């Protein structure tokens, strides 16, 4: 699929949370401050990267989708479901390499551009 001029990309706040938790856990595991330097650098790069996108909130509409779908999609991870519900609430296409899990979400439009 070709990207056309003017197309915009957005990222779910839940995706940002996942990435932040990963780097914060890495920083917390390091006992030596000198070893935390690179992880803090990477965390800073992450902030700058995500700042280039529109950030989609996990709002009341997304939460309502989440509450409605939680019971029927128990095997879908909480964060993946939050990401899916954010996309549903914003009525956007979700780009993912994880088609198998996300295609179970009713009404969610997904594509894998890595295929």
Predicted regions and their residues:
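Acidic, PIN/NYN-like endoribonuclease modules and their adjacent C-terminal/linker elements
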Residues: 84, 88-115
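PIN-domain endoribonuclease scaffold, especially VapC-family toxins
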Residues: 1-85, 89, 103
